[in-house]
């Protein structure tokens, strides 16, 4: 009886968490405690001249407890001459500091931070420490789950540093920015949960924006996506990111994002 209760509680927790797994952003909720995850993000981004940029970002994730989780991520791309090259990596941590749970809803708030190293050339005004710039980001996330609909928003400060050893950040450009996001997702299938083996299908729409602090240049992107959760452990995401407007130089803002993820529950004692 005790074993059945534990399995049931884990199923409820995982099913609820799976409704908040946004493609382009992180929710305030954490992955289940003592779990371990692997993720691989593939981005096919289109430059103005028609050239295709491919970025691969493998990632390891650890749910330390219900409040803390950490990620380690690598950056690989074909932007440099000579084919694919490992350009850098990052460490990410998130602390969930507030939770309010009701019968069919909950509200979460979290703080997060990222520190990245990157050796690639600095080729745009946009600041992006996830794959382009050496630097750091610190921010706040709030996520509301209302039955089958999840709404999440974030605000963060991002700072770019020199891409050592060869590329200094241009002194004529803004080296810091404020980022803001709004994500909405809805569970489309299944209509009723009967088994953890059911495939979850989520549809999402996300808005992603940035405003440079010194020169006040900005952009806003939109990213519709579809997500499949298989047996509550495997995840497949497909999204398209499209620039709505921009007053800054961005090398390749539009493109397709494909993610694969797998979570190992109770991987640590």
What does each model-identified segment do?
Residues 18-163, 171-269:
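Transmembrane beta-barrel domains of Gram-negative outer membranes and organellar outer membranes
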């Amino acid at each position: 009886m005790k074993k059945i209760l534990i399995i049931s509680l884990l199923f409820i927790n995982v099913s609820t968490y799976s409704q908040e797994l946004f493609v382009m952003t992180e929710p305030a909720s954490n992955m289940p405690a003592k779990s371990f995850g692997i993720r691989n993000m593939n981005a096919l981004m289109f430059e103005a001249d028609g050239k295709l940029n491919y970025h691969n970002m493998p990632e390891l994730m650890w749910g330390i407890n219900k409040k803390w989780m950490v990620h380690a991520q690598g950056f690989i791309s074909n932007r440099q001459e000579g084919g694919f090259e490992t350009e850098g990596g990052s460490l990410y941590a998130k602390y969930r500091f507030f939770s309010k749970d009701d019968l069919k809803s909950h509200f979460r708030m979290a703080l997060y931070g990222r520190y990245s190293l990157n050796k690639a050339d600095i080729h745009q005004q946009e600041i992006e420490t996830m794959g382009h710039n050496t630097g750091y980001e610190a921010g706040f996330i709030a996520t509301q789950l209302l039955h089958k609909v999840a709404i999440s928003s974030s605000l963060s400060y991002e700072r770019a540093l020199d891409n050592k050893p060869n590329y200094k950040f241009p002194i004529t450009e803004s080296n810091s920015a404020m980022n803001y996001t709004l994500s909405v997702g809805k569970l489309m299938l299944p209509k009723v949960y009967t088994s953890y083996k059911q495939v979850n299908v989520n549809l999402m729409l996300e808005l992603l924006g940035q405003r440079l602090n010194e020169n006040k240049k900005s952009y806003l992107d939109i990213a519709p996506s579809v997500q499949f959760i298989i047996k509550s452990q495997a995840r497949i995401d497909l999204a398209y990111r499209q620039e709505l407007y921009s007053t800054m130089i961005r090398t390749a803002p539009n493109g397709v994002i494909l993610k694969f993820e797998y979570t190992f529950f109770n991987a640590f004692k």
